[in-house]
Design a protein with these regions (language model features):
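C-terminal beta-signal and adjacent terminal beta-strands/loops
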Residues: 303, 656-661, 668-702, 716-723, ...
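Short, acidic, small-residue-rich periplasmic hinge/interaction motif at the N-terminus
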Residues: 39, 44, 49-54, 83-85, ...
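Periplasmic N-terminal accessory/gating domains of Gram-negative outer-membrane beta-barrel systems
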Residues: 120-225, 236, 242-243
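Transmembrane beta-barrel wall of Gram-negative outer-membrane proteins
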Residues: 35, 258-282, 295-330, 335-367, ...
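Outer membrane beta-barrel strand-and-loop segments of large Gram-negative receptors
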Residues: 389-393, 430-440, 536-540, 546, ...
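Short, acidic Ser/Thr/Gly-rich low-complexity loop/linker segments typical of extracellular
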Residues: 56-67
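Surface-exposed extracellular loop regions of Gram-negative outer-membrane beta-barrel proteins
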Residues: 371, 493-547, 565-585, 666-679, ...
Length: 779
């Protein structure tokens, strides 16, 4: 055909010179792109499915969102075949026509009856397989089923599962904090369906604000995250909720000694392919502990409430979601005071896969607000902190076979209101509004795509993935444009992979809590202050650089070993000035520091047994230009072992299949955290700056503590704990399932130290042995 076109054009002079390139390129432009999404019967993405275009040798794998794209298809008739473990093979007849350059498909796969038991294995825990479709270094995906296999404090919660991840340090059960690979809580970005969450954990730190059963997936980026995330310098926790049941009304209700809750979901009436989901839970720990655990020296004065609702319109890649949430938390310390906070927000997000275009469009907009108050008779005024604002944006992504190009625009605006008075009467107050704009571009290049055998299985995985990205983040209040290059890359073999990630990160927010406080109840948020003592700085923002190297190896069919080394350089940090004595002293100081470590994780998975073990070595240093010290979360060694075993007959209900019995355990070991030793006490005279001071010769001063000049030079004893759980499932009817869970926390009653009161020398331990019984009804 092409030769005939060239012959017809011969001898036509100028027309030949103009039309010849079009004649050559015409057949190339006539090629078609076939793209789409592969979903299961619940509307969730089928990840890693093999998509082949028969009878050609073209093929690819679905990505993390179930999407695929096959380009360069000549006009003609083909059969698109989709295969994956646990689903029936899909075959779709495709007619490629040059008049329709892009063909968009939405494929729904039915569960394979033959592979049903295998499906249960995959759902019960993350498969012990290397993911060939994306760079996974410094990323831990958490599925709800993984959380449910962990022995829990009354009810399974993502906060408890985060504690067993490599690189995570947890400082205590009551008011403790979560530190991810050398970063503080304020340096961790938490997103709920795209909305910024200011306080992801309750004061009783074993509970997050997220009901486990509404979660679709949690992605924890512990270092080296890409340009799609910004505004934080250490880590990201991206939480996505699932839609409600599209087919029928269903739900669950549960009761434990500390928490009770319910979740309901179902299709919206009169609107096709739509659903709703609503969850609520109430913590009544303060009321329950005196009756159920009379041996506790101190009650647990905690109360909290979590509410979440969501409606979904559409299934698969074309979808609109609207959601709202509210959380409250209260700690009554009696004579010491009362700390309470509330958090609420609402928003929406959508995804769209246009039929006649190669682009995929996603967008989101959300508003959230957090208020915290602490009232104590020992303080002149109540502490108060409030932060709230909006964030939103649009992302446009293109699939070119296995390659992907994405770019986005974002906008954020928030305001802060902070008031704090210290013991000398010095007031720290800030009211400020900020606007930020950002844009990023990310390109994922697959240098060598997998070749598919005749049986439809990969002969070898994708050999190399390079994912450079660039984020431009403009801070309007400071007139500062932050240029943040990022890079993620992966090299795959048959049974191994090598990965790396690096980047520059900047953030605006500062915590009003000192990094040197162990117990944190009051949470204050401020924007980055101008620090007069460091006027030579080019900007007041916090800044860090990351480098991560990792490798995976498939030991056997059921073992997966992951090893990662990481380094974070904090070139500019802002902290509370604990040495402030006079009004002219700065409220904040600048610090620098670094953190590095090595994390090992080994996962073993069979149909009935799941084992997950981790070990972390971590080293943290800070320099406040007075001294170099270890921060309080500098735990040198951490080890975790999590296991679960299921047995007994299957309990079949509409919601799925479950084994009747399940036993699980969790054991944690951590070396001692650093602390500053007490040298003695002295009488401190008060000199009030307003001139009305008492004569020092007759004044009765206050008791003050003389601390060692070497900050955090000593270590607390090591921490270790064993938790056990046994679960029994009984089918009550075709649609009802009753779960009974008996758990034992701190099974051998290890007295792990939390902190020691310096004045009274009283030791406060973390939670002792605590047996629990929980009931859950599912329908």
């Amino acid at each position: 055909m092409l030769s005939h076109r060239l012959s017809a054009l011969a001898g036509q002079g100028w027309a030949q010179r103009i039309l010849l390139p079009w004649a050559i390129l015409g057949p190339l432009w006539a090629q078609v792109t076939i793209r789409g999404a592969v979903l299961d019967k619940e509307g969730d993405a089928v990840v890693g499915a093999i998509v082949r275009l028969l009878p050609t040798n073209k093929g690819t794998l679905t990505n993390a969102e179930g999407l695929f794209s096959i380009s360069g298809v000549p006009p003609g008739e083909y059969t698109l075949q989709v295969t994956a473990v646990g689903i029936d093979t899909l075959r779709e007849t495709i007619k490629a026509d040059a008049r329709r350059p892009v063909i968009t498909l939405k494929l729904t796969a039915a569960t394979s009856a033959v592979e049903l038991s295998t499906v249960e294995i995959i759902e019960s825990a993350t498969p012990a397989k290397i993911d060939p479709t994306r760079v996974t270094v410094a990323v831990t995906p958490i599925a709800p089923r993984q959380i449910y296999t962990l022995p829990s404090f009354g009810v399974p919660d993502v906060a408890q599962y985060l504690q067993v991840l490599p690189g995570v340090v947890f400082t205590g059960d009551q008011g403790g904090q979560l530190y991810i690979r050398g970063g503080t809580p304020i340096q961790n970005l938490t997103l709920l369906d795209g909305a910024i969450i200011y306080s992801p954990f309750h004061t009783l730190s074993l509970f997050s604000i997220f009901e486990t059963d509404i979660l679709r997936q949690v992605q924890v980026y512990s270092a080296g995250f890409g340009a799609e995330y910004g505004g934080r310098i250490s880590s990201v926790m991206d939480i996505r909720t699932r839609p409600g049941n599209f087919e029928r009304f269903s739900g669950r209700a549960y009761a434990t000694p500390f928490v009770a809750g319910a979740l309901t979901e179902g299709p919206l009436p009169f609107i096709r392919n739509s659903s709703w989901i609503l969850s609520a839970r109430q913590g009544y720990i303060q009321q329950a502990t005196p009756r159920l655990y009379p041996y506790l020296k101190d009650s647990l004065p905690f109360q909290f409430q979590d509410l979440y609702g969501k409606v979904t319109f559409g299934r698969g890649p074309d979808q609109l979601n609207l959601f709202g949430f509210r959380q409250t938390d209260r700690v009554d310390l009696g004579a010491q005071g009362v700390n309470s906070w509330q958090q609420w927000g609402a928003g929406g997000f959508f995804t769209n896969l246009p039929q006649a275009s190669r682009v995929r469009i996603t967008g989101s907009f959300a508003y959230s607000r957090f208020q915290n108050t602490f009232e104590s008779p020992f303080e002149l005024r109540p502490r108060y902190s409030e932060i709230g604002g909006f964030n939103g944006g649009f992302t446009f992504s293109y699939l070119f076979g296995a390659d992907e190009l994405a770019y986005a625009i974002e906008v954020r605006g928030f305001s802060t209101d902070f008031l704090f008075t210290n013991g000398l009467g010095f007031i720290t107050q800030q009211r400020q509004s900020n606007t930020e704009g950002a844009s990023y571009v990310r390109y994922q290049k697959v240098f060598r795509q997998e070749t598919l055998s005749e049986e439809g299985t990969p002969t070898f995985f994708t050999r190399a993935i390079i994912e450079p990205s660039l984020r431009l983040h403009f801070y309007n209040n400071y007139g500062y444009l932050s240029v943040e290059p990022r890079l993620r890359a992966k090299l795959n073999g048959r049974r191994w992979s090598l990965q790396t990630a690096a980047g520059r990160y900047v953030q605006n927010w500062v915590s009003a809590v000192s990094d040197r406080d162990i117990v944190v109840l009051f949470q204050g948020f401020l924007t980055a202050p101008e620090i007069a003592a460091n006027a030579q700085l080019s900007h007041p923002l916090q800044e860090a650089y990351h480098l991560t190297l990792g490798g995976e190896y498939q030991l056997l069919s059921a073992f997966l070993l992951n090893v990662e080394g990481w380094y974070k350089r904090f070139t500019q940090l802002t902290n509370i000035n604990r040495e402030r004595l006079f009004p002219e002293d700065p409220t904040f100081i600048t610090e620098i520091g670094y953190a590095y470590g090595v994390d090992l994780a080994l996962r073993y998975q069979t149909p009935t047994l799941s084992l997950y073990g981790t070990y972390s070595y971590q080293y943290n240093r800070r320099d406040d230009f007075r001294q170099v010290y270890f921060p309080l979360w500098d735990r040198r060694h951490t080890a975790n072992l999590v296991g679960s075993y299921t047995w007994g007959p299957w309990q079949n209900v509409r919601r799925g299949r479950e084994r009747r019995w399940e036993a699980s355990l969790r054991w944690t070991l951590g070396s001692g955290l650093p602390f500053t030793q007490t040298l003695g006490f002295f009488e401190k005279l008060l000199f009030i700056p307003n001139g009305s001071q008492n004569p020092y010769s007759t004044q009765q001063g206050i008791l003050a503590i003389l601390l060692s000049p070497h900050y955090n030079a000593a270590r607390l004893p090591a921490y270790h704990r064993l938790d056990l759980a046994l679960k029994y499932r009984q089918r009550l009817s075709e649609t009802l399932l009753l779960e009974t869970t008996v758990s034992l926390l701190n099974a051998y009653n290890r007295p792990n130290v939390f902190y020691i009161d310096r004045i009274t020398a009283r030791r406060y331990n973390q939670l002792p042995i605590m047996p629990m019984l929980g009931l859950t009804l599912l329908w």
